[in-house]
């Protein structure tokens, strides 16, 4: 009892849970009272060195019963794998020569508390019993049979069982090597310092499963875990790694409760809960065999064949038993298990086991009944659901299905790892000793642990067996998919592997009904090209899709960005492309009309000019003022020419000519007309005051005045050239519409609207001034001068330009600005030139060509007579007319012989007075 109290203090300092202490004390108390009888269900094999073994030979029993049905694969296969490995090692002269390995193998019944109670058997030899007060009937002290010393333990299977057992074994410094426990917390070398395993931890497995899920394009999954360390810690690792990897969301994390009376209801509720998130079709499972079987059955009851996409951990692996009668629900399931190979020697060994040659396995008879569905005649048979008698002649693999269980390889590797450690320890401590020397006998578990962590050999699968500083094996996994259709061999198919990185053969995968296309398990379908994701708060894998609008393109899946200034989005808005460059084309309707008018005007102007040159010395041509007439015709011609410059493809030369000729044609035209109207006005104003002719009315003076007016325009253009040299630009604002598809860059000269108005402003000023003079000279007789035709010309021109201004500026924001403004400007200039050409020149050309009899010189008058006649005409114009058409018209000129001396003497020259 003293030893028990000491152990209690030690366990208390280790902060064991109260329930563990209670179980431990009860078991130790029984051992201390001298109960040396071994449990009826255990295997004991004599040897120089004894290894412990923990295997889930039976499933959990119902409430109140420790053990349930026998587990043929996970239990018996694994247990026999240890016995097979012991046989191989004991028969190997090169491994532990002269040393025989024994074993003490116990059943954990897949329950951690029961396994803890059973594992106390391993520490009995290390507990010193106080027998001072115990005497036999003869007064002699009792003789106790000392239990064999267990130097190391192989097991356990479930992580929760291994954790419970590891807590007690570390107290007695007994090394432990597991063949199936993968819980990440067992990697904590401070808490489980005597624990090692030949399988990788779930942290590697979880990483592999995350990689699989991401490779299949699934970003919205649910997790399902059996209650306990393996399931809960596995899901915890998966969740943590998925968060670190990003792009993967957990829809639901469901835990499968244990120790419930009616578990069928629980599994039906779990399936219903998983269906609450229908888009989360992928379900990552960290569960034991029984829970996997029950969850598949519940899914089948819910008629969800083909809905769930199962991703199973190594507890599912490539096992057949959990899928029995639920193959349709499991079709397409992806499972993972540590990389392994079939141990052929074990197959031969196991299939040769019979009731006669395998009496050392105390559970083999029960396995025989379950495997062959028969009943043995021996008492204590548990097979009550059949009347078929076992003959003992049945053979495994012939009379029953047989497939090597997935963890057999790792059981063998675990036993060999312990054997290699003992071998090296024996060589170091017992170099000159055959068998187990006293030094090795007295060596503690810490020393053996050191040798275990340093082993490195090729295991039964040909892969290296080694441990890192935490006692973990490297991560190497095979990836399987359960396939039943379109295959000659239904079952698990190897589709990839994971060794630090994923290698997955997606082309070998298939899903329900043989479908090859990977089904979706996403919260929201991927956005279309040109749309960005707008995630929902708290669920980054769920989003709404928002189109990139305007001039934005999809920069990445979360962001829309504006295209550069000179680009627009491409058709699907996944990038940008250059905005097309346009200019006013010759074939455009906007250009055809101005060009047509300009060509007609140029032809007419050339015709008029040719006519005037041909009839240069005729009275009408001379009377119209030949010098200014040619100047005016030049201006009209330039007004037509500017149309071609405005439509031509812009370059530096074209832009230079545009600047020069844009206002020059109008300036020349209106400078000549202004000079004419000003001369008329001054002549008649001067005539009212005196008979002396005004100054500067000679042709030379008129040309000088006109030239000076034109030079102002040219000076302004030269200043413009100096301040802002001609250049071409591409204007992207002018044609940047709301719809990017219609956006265009306009190739044009670097001339702003304001500069155009400034260039035309001087000409417009001349036009307005000329109009004012035309109004003032409106009373001059029409046959005497050109004042009235000039007046009509200016009135019409003003109307044209008054219409031009609102059209030009009113379309400044229009997408058709280039076309409208260019067309408006050129047509306005064409109309202005045509009005002047038509009103001032066409009547004269008509007379010259069709009525040459009227093209004669009229009688000359003195300057005073001209003025007096004009004054009288102005007065008579207010009196009623006796003519039929009501005209108040006075003929001031008579036909006279110009060569008569009287004419030369009494009259001034007509040519000097007629305007």
Curated annotation (Swiss-Prot):
<feature type="topological domain" description="Cytoplasmic">
    <location>
        <begin position="616"/>
        <end position="627"/>
    </location>
</feature>
<keyword id="KW-0297">G-protein coupled receptor</keyword>
<dbReference type="GO" id="GO:0005938">
    <property type="term" value="C:cell cortex"/>
</dbReference>
<dbReference type="GO" id="GO:0001642">
    <property type="term" value="F:group III metabotropic glutamate receptor activity"/>
</dbReference>
<keyword id="KW-0325">Glycoprotein</keyword>
<feature type="disulfide bond">
    <location>
        <begin position="430"/>
        <end position="437"/>
    </location>
</feature>
<dbReference type="GO" id="GO:0045211">
    <property type="term" value="C:postsynaptic membrane"/>
</dbReference>
<dbReference type="GO" id="GO:0051966">
    <property type="term" value="P:regulation of synaptic transmission, glutamatergic"/>
</dbReference>
<feature type="disulfide bond">
    <location>
        <begin position="548"/>
        <end position="560"/>
    </location>
</feature>
<feature type="disulfide bond">
    <location>
        <begin position="249"/>
        <end position="541"/>
    </location>
</feature>
<feature type="glycosylation site" description="N-linked (GlcNAc...) asparagine">
    <location>
        <position position="98"/>
    </location>
</feature>
<keyword id="KW-0887">Epilepsy</keyword>
<feature type="transmembrane region" description="Helical; Name=3">
    <location>
        <begin position="655"/>
        <end position="675"/>
    </location>
</feature>
<feature type="modified residue" description="Phosphoserine">
    <location>
        <position position="900"/>
    </location>
</feature>
<keyword id="KW-0716">Sensory transduction</keyword>
<dbReference type="GO" id="GO:0005886">
    <property type="term" value="C:plasma membrane"/>
</dbReference>
<dbReference type="InterPro" id="IPR000162">
    <property type="entry name" value="GPCR_3_mtglu_rcpt"/>
</dbReference>
<keyword id="KW-0812">Transmembrane</keyword>
<feature type="transmembrane region" description="Helical; Name=6">
    <location>
        <begin position="789"/>
        <end position="810"/>
    </location>
</feature>
<comment type="similarity">
    <text>Belongs to the G-protein coupled receptor 3 family.</text>
</comment>
<feature type="compositionally biased region" description="Basic and acidic residues">
    <location>
        <begin position="879"/>
        <end position="892"/>
    </location>
</feature>
<dbReference type="InterPro" id="IPR017978">
    <property type="entry name" value="GPCR_3_C"/>
</dbReference>
<feature type="transmembrane region" description="Helical; Name=4">
    <location>
        <begin position="703"/>
        <end position="723"/>
    </location>
</feature>
<feature type="binding site">
    <location>
        <position position="314"/>
    </location>
    <ligand>
        <name>L-glutamate</name>
    </ligand>
</feature>
<feature type="binding site">
    <location>
        <position position="159"/>
    </location>
    <ligand>
        <name>L-glutamate</name>
    </ligand>
</feature>
<dbReference type="GO" id="GO:0010855">
    <property type="term" value="F:adenylate cyclase inhibitor activity"/>
</dbReference>
<keyword id="KW-0675">Receptor</keyword>
<feature type="signal peptide">
    <location>
        <begin position="1"/>
        <end position="34"/>
    </location>
</feature>
<dbReference type="Pfam" id="PF01094">
    <property type="entry name" value="ANF_receptor"/>
</dbReference>
<dbReference type="InterPro" id="IPR017979">
    <property type="entry name" value="GPCR_3_CS"/>
</dbReference>
<feature type="disulfide bond">
    <location>
        <begin position="527"/>
        <end position="545"/>
    </location>
</feature>
<dbReference type="GO" id="GO:0030425">
    <property type="term" value="C:dendrite"/>
</dbReference>
<dbReference type="GO" id="GO:0007268">
    <property type="term" value="P:chemical synaptic transmission"/>
</dbReference>
<dbReference type="Pfam" id="PF07562">
    <property type="entry name" value="NCD3G"/>
</dbReference>
<dbReference type="GO" id="GO:0043198">
    <property type="term" value="C:dendritic shaft"/>
</dbReference>
<dbReference type="GO" id="GO:0070905">
    <property type="term" value="F:serine binding"/>
</dbReference>
<dbReference type="InterPro" id="IPR001883">
    <property type="entry name" value="GPCR_3_mGluR7"/>
</dbReference>
<dbReference type="GO" id="GO:0030424">
    <property type="term" value="C:axon"/>
</dbReference>
<feature type="glycosylation site" description="N-linked (GlcNAc...) asparagine">
    <location>
        <position position="458"/>
    </location>
</feature>
<feature type="transmembrane region" description="Helical; Name=7">
    <location>
        <begin position="826"/>
        <end position="850"/>
    </location>
</feature>
<keyword id="KW-1133">Transmembrane helix</keyword>
<feature type="topological domain" description="Extracellular">
    <location>
        <begin position="35"/>
        <end position="590"/>
    </location>
</feature>
